[in-house]
Amino acid sequence: MTVQTDKRPAAIRVVIPFVFRHWLQQPGRAAIVAGGLLGATAADLFMPIFSGRLVDALTLGASDAAARHAAFVAFGGIVALGLMSMVLRLTGLQAIVPFTLKTMSDVSRDAFARVQRFSTDWHANSFAGSTVRKVTRGMWALDLLNDTILMALLPSLLVLVGSMVLLGLHWPVLGAVIAVGTVIYVSMTMAFSVNYIAPAARVSNAWDTKVGGTLADALTCNAVVKSFGAEAREDARLAGVIGRWRTRVRRTWYRYNYTSTAQLVVLLCFRGSVIGGAILLWIAGRATPGDVTYVLTSYYIIHAYLRDVGMHINNLQRSVNDMEELVAIHGEPIGIADAPDAKPIDIQGGRIVFDDVTFHYGGHRAPLYDGLSVEIRAGERVGLVGRSGSGKTTFVKLVQRLYDVSGGKILIDGQDIAQATQHSLRSQIAIVQQEPILFHRTLAENIAYGRPGASMAAIEQAARLANAHDFILRLPKGYGTLVGERGVKLSGGERQRVALARAFLADAPVLILDEATSSLDSESEGLIQQAMERLMKGRTSIVIAHRLS
């Protein structure tokens, strides 16, 4: 098992614009969040000024009336700024909750909608578990990213720039020291994060996705694992994948540690420069004890924000890396897309025409069909017989437009299916597969899947026509029985009859039966053949089989 390291754009250049586009869908909330949190930070920013004035007032002694007045004014300013900070911060925090939740909901819903519309080939070549992991990991990473930018980095930026300006107005040298130190620290942190941590994090995330895919693969095929007594073999397979994942994650985490150490070294030098500069100003008589207090208080606020900026930039990079695969989903081509002027198709009789159709699968040089012309009359029953790999299932997939033809066209009732919307086409074609797939939902929900909102009476009538009603009533909860993942709680014959009931209820003018009785016992086959005979009446029916019998 390998992980490809394709040359994609830096994750941060792709993810951040993606997130900002979602922010712009909630401009009001975004403004309240940013305004509240930045306002609270601005209040904190002016706190050292009043602290310095309070110290200067106290050094004059309590007997001085002007000093007492100055002390009370400074005290009042500190309290007022504290209250303002508290109210504004609460406002921002209250607004960020619905803001982030809606963004997370939109991102996950959009990703799911896009994955649902990817081509059959895409799904055949993807692990379902890996895809789920990409979406859920990216959704929760968005929570961290929102918090990091709105609650941490923006306030930090305001503190750093504001402190530099305020101190620079009094002592330009100190303002310059803070500016240079901040630029060095932030630049170094970003360089380490993007060029040192991010490449390792990208690889570890790819292996995290592999772990999810391996788990899903084994759990989905658990019946096969048990039938071969292969539990230990699957344990070993997962252990191998986890071992490689652990190696990659360990490397990433160590890089975080090395980066943190480098940040602490820069902060130590920065601290010495600022505090030393304040002492020199005091020695030179250019700063009072209150001024020194102001500088020290400002520095420790800056220090706290700078120290946290390192952590926040690391968190930003981590969340960006975790979102990268989710965002990449939106960059993948759909595969089979509706034409810009596509219209709903109206199928009445169900006459199907293959007009000089050429088709080959991607990566195959030789075409499977080369100039194929076939006509199936409305209401006609047609059998497709042949060995495995001869193109029987491909034929019906082309009718459903799960693939696009390489040449020629396919018409239904004289309408080119390439110019029809996929939803309207497939909703008028019912299919019963050799291995019917059921959702882990109730029997009633599975039968009604092709006709949402169908009444219970219609569901039961479809089940009767499919010879499924009697066995359903024998189940503990009847039509309310959950069938298990992919219908695992039902036998093969029962699943097939539920699939037939689903086709009955859909009442589509075109019917496809794909090896519907090939793997059933004689009793189940007899019941299903009776139901199939009823189902095919009055419909254009394509029946796939290995042999004529």
Describe the function of each predicted region.
Residues 1-44, 59-78, 92-96, 100, ...:
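Membrane-integrated ABC transporters
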Residues 2-12, 35, 43-56, 81-128, ...:
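Juxtamembrane helix-loop junctions of ABC transporter transmembrane domains
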Residues 20, 24-27, 117-124, 137-146, ...:
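An intracellular "coupling" helix at the cytosolic face of ABC transporter transmembrane type-1 domains
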Residues 30-91, 168-176, 272, 276, ...:
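Transmembrane helix-loop-helix hairpins at lipid-water interfaces of multipass membrane proteins
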Residues 62, 166-184, 195, 255-324, ...:
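Helix-loop-helix
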Residues 111, 115, 225, 326, ...:
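Helix-loop junctions and hydrophobic alpha-helical segments within the transmembrane domains
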Residues 120, 224, 332-335, 459, ...:
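Hydrophobic patch in the ABC ATPase nucleotide-binding domain
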Residues 345-549:
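ABC-type nucleotide-binding domain
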